[in-house]
Amino acid sequence: MTLLQALILAIVQGITEPFPVSSLGHAVLLPALLHWDLDEHAPMFLPFLTMLHVGTLVALAGVFWRDWMAILGGMFGRYGSYRQMEAIRIFGLLVIATIPAVLVGWLLEHRLRAVFGTPLAVAGFLILNGFLLMVTEWLRRQKGHRDHKPIATLAPKDAVIIGIWQCLALLPGLSRSGATMNGGLLRGLDHETAARFSLLMAQPIVLAATVREAWQMRHMTISHDIMVQCVAGAVVAGLTALICSLVMLRFFRNHDGWALTPFGVYCVLAGLFAGAVILL
């Protein structure tokens, strides 16, 4: 992998991690479409992947540091206060929503990616991701959801349902953030709140993936060239994810009636284009 390829992958990771368009799907399709000879299973690719996760994790933590301070500070605040009860409830909802994907991922993640990780399959799932985003918008309009329901008002059942939606992202091409936003919207959240809950959910999962990858490469010797790619990739992915997260939250705040639709259209068109190129 060249430095230019590393930077392009970092930019794509930073853009697609917060947006509901599947970061994993783009990571599979882009090298295939550009005919890059990359072996993502090579030992030297793991440090690069880990540092991309570190970059996006730091970016997301930077965007949502006030949320985490409110949650963690509230949990250890004055005993029995409303702020403490609300913080404990939100933290509990995040834990509940994370459990389904952790369990299913532990059992099936590698098998699903081995079976459905081909570029053509990913293109198909990217098209499906787009349709799911657009169908969710249509269903939400049919139900007349125009309220601004806070995260703390979700029931544990709502968190479980959002967590089940997240399991779809184990299929390459289906977006994790898109799936959880779909679940949040259908449980009564507005677009900005659904995105906020989705990206708060993402951070423990990205952290767990980073720790796992770091453990796997604990005995690895990393060359200077790979280290340069890793550091550059982390910085670029982090800055890109930071900007895109802020842009996305603002966009969702100002376009609550149809915010997922453009992403849905993009996924369908991108999937069709990628599938056509692969087949031809």
Swiss-Prot record:
Entries under InterPro entries matching the protein: UppP
Gene name linked to the record: uppP
Its EC number(s): 3.6.1.27
Organism expressing this protein natively: Gluconobacter oxydans (strain 621H)
Domain of life of the source: Bacteria
Protein name: Undecaprenyl-diphosphatase
Membrane-topology annotation of the record: Multi-pass membrane protein
Main location: membrane
Any GO BP: response to antibiotic
Miscellaneous comment in the UniProt entry for this protein: Bacitracin is thought to be involved in the inhibition of peptidoglycan synthesis by sequestering undecaprenyl diphosphate, thereby reducing the pool of lipid carrier available.
Swiss-Prot/TrEMBL keywords: Antibiotic resistance, Cell inner membrane, Cell membrane, Cell shape, Cell wall biogenesis/degradation, Hydrolase, Membrane, Peptidoglycan synthesis, Transmembrane, Transmembrane helix
Enzyme class at the top of the EC tree: hydrolase
Protein family (similarity comment): Belongs to the UppP family.
Keyword Cell wall biogenesis/degradation belongs to the record: yes
Bilayer-crossing regions: 1-21, 45-65, 90-110, 115-135, 151-171, 226-246, 260-280
